A protein has these predicted regions:
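Compositionally biased terminal segments of proteins
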Residues: 1-183
Length: 183
């Protein structure tokens, strides 16, 4: 996984339209609290101009580097508008989701560089942003990750509540915090 992550970082660092990027999946959760097993890499990226052609340029760079995959385009009602889904030569699945809302761009740009694998540092979305993204996604694992972050990580509660409101998961957040005895 380390080789794949290094290559992804190299490509994103040299992709002209990429303003910022940060890990958002299990690796990111493990950067803030006790790591959990994960087999994939999830990244949220912010482009200077979020267009299909700019995203296709990133995909071309990945394919040239030996990744296999495609660009998935969401519909108007989908939370995810553009997502590159690729698999590395190491057989590691990678999802690169592109920010389509202002709050998403903000949490990427506010990412903090953390060592996630020995000798390998990358920006991570801060705990407040991760909790909101996990509540947006809503799977069992996502809610479990959000719960662990709420209980174990250090975060700014007011910032978390503001982000949750902007992402329209504020009621979900309050219910989860109540269930966890955090209110």
């Amino acid at each position: 996984m380390g080789k794949t992550l290094k290559e992804i970082i190299r490509i994103l660092e040299h992709a002209g339209d990429v303003k910022a990027y940060a890990l958002i999946g299990g690796l990111a959760v493990g950067g803030w609290i006790a790591p959990r097993a994960t087999r994939d890499i999830d990244i949220l990226a912010d482009l200077s101009v979020t267009t299909r052609s700019a995203i296709e340029e990133v995909l071309k760079k990945l394919i040239t580097a030996g990744f296999k995959g495609s660009l998935e385009i969401g519909g108007p009602e989908d939370d995810i508008k553009f997502c590159i889904k690729v698999v590395s030569g190491e057989n590691v699945p990678v999802d690169i989701i592109f920010a389509s809302r202002k709050w998403e761009a903000e949490i990427v740009e506010e990412g903090m560089v953390v060592e996630v694998l020995k000798g390998l540092s990358i920006p991570l979305v801060r705990p407040e942003g991760l909790v909101v993204l996990k509540l947006k996604a809503g799977s069992f694992q996502d809610v479990a990750d959000a719960s662990k972050l709420l209980v174990e990580a250090e975060y700014d509660l007011q910032r978390l509540r503001n982000l949750a409101k902007r992402a329209r998961v504020d009621k979900r957040l309050e219910r989860l915090m109540e269930k966890l005895g955090l209110t």
